[in-house]
């Protein structure tokens, strides 16, 4: 993941966050679907995770760990 994109999103750049969400949505959705076993519930969980990621992004200390951090949120 592009560390600068993550840093820009942390600074409140909505376009950077939209790019992050687009880049990671599929992977987050697969994780949710594997856990929940239901496509509709996985979609809901992924959408909620994206909202939670936006809210919690300022708390991320190491932008290089964005992907692992975002997976923890979806779980």
Predicted feature descriptions by range:
Residues 34-36, 57-60, 74-75:
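Conserved short hydrophobic patches within well-ordered secondary structure
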Residues 6-7:
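Amphipathic alpha-helical repeat scaffolds
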Residues 20-24, 28, 74:
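Hydrophobic/aromatic residues within well-ordered alpha-helical segments
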